[in-house]
Amino acid sequence: SSANSINIGRLAPQVTYYFDAYAQLVAKGTIAQGQKVTFCVPTGNFGDVLAGYFAKEMGLPVERLIVASNSNKVLTDFLETGIYDRRRAFEKTISPSMDILVSSNLERLLYLASGKDTELVSYLMNLLVTKGIYTVPEQVMDTIRETFDAGFATDDQTRETIRSTWENCRVLIDPHTAVAKHVLDRVSRQANDVRVCLSTASPY
């Protein structure tokens, strides 16, 4: 099978990104060993951010994982409401790798957050196929929200973030990374918060 984002073989090496980023922060003296870090991840299929969750479960000190979506914000709506609803218009955006309405890796998170309740997960996935919508029990959503936040960026906001990042930092970022930076910039920041914006593609 191909190494697309539903393949667990792709998620496994992505886990190392989080440990490597954390190790670099420690080596540079930005954080102390054991200090928690928040990661913001541009994603449509929930693969890369799920790798971050795996890293946390393996012991990496992760404060929050922020799911950044484009205008196809099915994940943002899900994390806010507990309702996954793919019955919506599909938008073609300038961050096409995130143009997804059925986020296949979310099933893996539901399995873990529900205490490995295979009957529940199977029921929810069947609803997604037959009805296009499902509602996750509040107890499971509470577990998910202990780690995950979410936000989204429109194409105009994405373009503006690319422009402002270049003007202010002289760093050229691709549209997918810009989605994450836009979302991260709008999350309230506490004193001593350390945050990492994942860049998942290159503009070059």
Put a short name on every predicted segment:
Residues 1-204:
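PLP-dependent amino-acid enzyme catalytic core
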